[in-house]
Structure formats: C-alpha cells, structure tokens
Amino acid sequence: MSATETTTAVEYLQPRYSPRITGRDDAAERGQPDIELSQLSSQPHNDHETTPNRAEPITQELKPVDRGRDAWCTLLGAFAFDALFWGFPGCYGVFQRYYSSVPAFQPDSPRIPVVGVLSTGFYYFGSPFSAMLATKFPRYQRQQIYLGWVLSITGLLSASFTSSVNGLIATQGALYGLGFVLISMPIVSMVNEWWVARKGMAFGLISASSGATGAVLPFIIDALLRRYGYKITLRACAVAMAVLTAPLLPLFKARLPASDQANLARINWDFLKKPLFWIYGSAVLVQGIGFFFPVVFLPSYASLFDISSTKGALLVSLMSIAQVLGQFAFGYLSDKSLPVSLLITTCCAFAATASFTFWGLAKSLPLLAIFSCIYGFFAFGFGTMRVAMGRAVSDDPSTVFATYAIFVFLMGVGNILVGPLSAELMAPREAVREQYAGNKYEPMVILTGVTSFFAALIVLAWHGGKVLLK
C-alpha cells in the first residue's frame, strides 16, 4: 500500500447507532496489531434506498502509523517536552546540594529532598489518574496539556519567591509535579496511537529525552546557582521552558477521531488475571525502591570525597548521556524478537553489579564516572521496558496504555520512599572515607544493589530456571 493510502473510519450521523467492527489500516497489512475503529455494517450503501432509521454515513480518513509528518511531529514534540519538563527535576541533585548550603533552609534541611521527591512523585503516582482523564475525555487531551503546562511553569516562578523549605515543597515540588503529570499522559496516549510496530523505539526515544538535557542542564543550573542564587535561577528556568515549549503545543494531535478514542478507552482488564503481569509488576516495584538513590545523592556522595560541585554535576551529566544510549538501545531491542524477560534481567543484573562495586568502592572521580555510565545505561534502560512488558501481557493497544500507567505508578513507590528511607539510612551514620561507601552511604548503596538484584531474580524465578531465549 502506498504512503498516501489511508483507512476510512465511518460514523453514523444519528447518535443512537454505534455499531462496531474491527478495521484494519495500512499498518495492519504489514503484520502490525489491529486498532479497533467505529465503523458501519459491512453491507454496501445503496443511494437509491431510503432507510428511515439510518442516515447517510460520512467518512474520515486516518493517516498511516509509524511514518508520516504527523507521526514524527507528535513524537518530536513529545521528545522536546519530556526533555525539558522531565529533565529539570532529574537535575534536582544539583539544587539539593545548593539548598543545603542556604542559611534560611538549614533548620529544615532534612526535608529538602522532599522537594525533588514530589516533583517526580506526582508523575509516578498520578499517572493512572492522568491517564484516566486522557481516555475518559479524549476531546480535551490538548486542553489537559495546556493546563499542565501552565501549572508547571507557575510552580517554578512561585518557587523563586519563597524563602522556606515548605514553600519549595509546595511550588517546585507539588505544583510543578502536578503540572507535569497532567502534561505527560495525553502525550503518551497520542504517541501510542501514532506508533504501533515501532512503539518500543518511539517510547525509548521519549524516555531518553530527559537524559539528553540531563547531559547539559546540570552544568547550566550549577553555574546559575553559584552566580545568581536560586531565585534568579528558577525564574530563568521558567522563562526558558515557556519560550522553548510554547511553539510546540500545536504539534500535539491525536490520530484517531474522538469517538474511536472513546472506544479504545474501553480497556480489557483481562491482563490482570495473567501471572506474568504480576511478575513484571513486582519486578518494577522492587527495582524502583532502590533506583532513585544514585540519581538524587550522587553529587552529595561525591562531595564526601572532596569532589567539587562542578565535577559532581559532571557525574550527573555522564549518567544522563548513558541514559540516552541505554533507553534508546533497549527500546529498539524491545521491538525485535529478543525476549522481554532477557532484556529485563540484563538491565537489573548490570545495575546491581555496578552498585555493589563501582559505587560502593569509589573514592575518586574515575570510579564514580564508570558507575555513572554503567548504571545510567542499564538501570534507566529497564524503565524503557514498561512498553515491552505491556505488549508481552496483551496485544490490545489500549491495554498497553493502561499497563504503562500502572508500571509507572509502581515505580513511583520507590520515588516516594527516597526521602524517608534516606533519612533513616543516613542519619545515624558518620562519614568515614576509608570504609565501604564512606560508611555514611553504605546502607543506601547496598539497598540500590539488592533491589536491582531481586528484580532480576523475580523474573528468573518465574521462568523456573529455563533458558530465557526459549
């Protein structure tokens, strides 16, 4: 079929008729999964007949999936939004280090990590609810994006006027996080419609986007904080985000008509009865408990060994570069014939090994740099597997969107636990450079490695020791 050929979705003019059959588009003819469309009965229409209870149908052309200008524009817009709005809280380790040195924040310094936890935690825990809004009211997905855009930028601007940790928690943490989760799920829904056979590649590219900005943004933020302070830095970030992303808002458009989106929103929940879903969900939950510690505390860990803030930002940057490569690579591999469980265990095994060795034994910049690269590639690569896990559980496109939101939610449990766990793990311990992980960070390093190891073990145990390639 040529690139100009499209599928026709037909709808009744009279609302009391809503018959459904399965429609195939050009993607399906290439062996890709079908997408259900609202269509008429297969009986041909006779122009000379008059049917009192039936109106003449109208047609609406659907554009091809996995290619074409609109598909790529939606994907590139999603890449840019995720790069900026997700990349910013990903650099919170730099902010946390600076906030810890501000005299006004000293009385509440143990609560400073809560700001970063909320800015990302809203995304993780709010994803199922944002996804419900996006599917329940498909006509208003773009409006949902606009609302989230305004809230996120307002959160940063408001944070620049506060002088307390509580103020930062409410603005840079909660308000920004709420805005981002409202942005994210409608965009995920649109990308899910436009990309079918290459879905893993598409979501791998989106996931890698925050790493692309994370390779540069820590240096910019660190320089701004040292020169201008946090208030000017937050205002500059808010203005930059608004200017860079506002022109991209018109790029986001759904592929399917709103009526067909509503039909796809009727999710088949049979995947909840499949043991494999719970196995993957358990692995995501366990891995997420330890996943965030290196992201948040690596610059602080480096400072324990007299590594400068600039070099600490370099470690975050290296991890972000590795994240880009890892998430795109594993997203691409998930579209191929490689077993999903093999990819999952590979990611978790390498992340665990890097944590126990290169992080725990590191007392200098070179070893920490090696850890940043290995952990960034494999631990973040695991996050890309959410789409592949959903497809392994069910072929239904709407189910993939639902499982994606659920897996994001499960990973968010670890994100929320970072603050209280870090306080409990680090508070009673003194820093001793000669000991493993500087003594102060030893429980944190061990927990990070153990959770990745057990996530791999859960999947391996389910397969009963069988060769994963079968």
Where do the model's predicted regions map?
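C-terminal transmembrane helical hairpin of 12-TM major facilitator-type secondary transporters
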Residues: 320-323, 327, 336-389, 405-408
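Conserved MFS/SLC helix-loop-helix module at the cytosolic interface between two early adjacent transmembrane helices
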Residues: 125-167
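Extracytoplasmic gate region of multi-pass secondary transporters
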Residues: 84-99, 273-332, 337, 341, ...
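Helix-to-loop junctions at the C-terminal end of transmembrane segments
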Residues: 123-140, 326-339, 358, 426-427
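Hydrophobic core of transmembrane alpha-helices in multi-pass small-molecule transporters
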Residues: 77-79, 83, 152-156, 165-186, ...
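Intracellular juxtamembrane helix-capping segments at the cytosolic ends
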Residues: 92, 99, 173, 180-195, ...
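A late C-terminal transmembrane helix in Major Facilitator Superfamily
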Residues: 394-438, 448
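Intrinsically disordered, low-complexity terminal tails of fungal membrane proteins
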Residues: 1-68, 254, 465-470
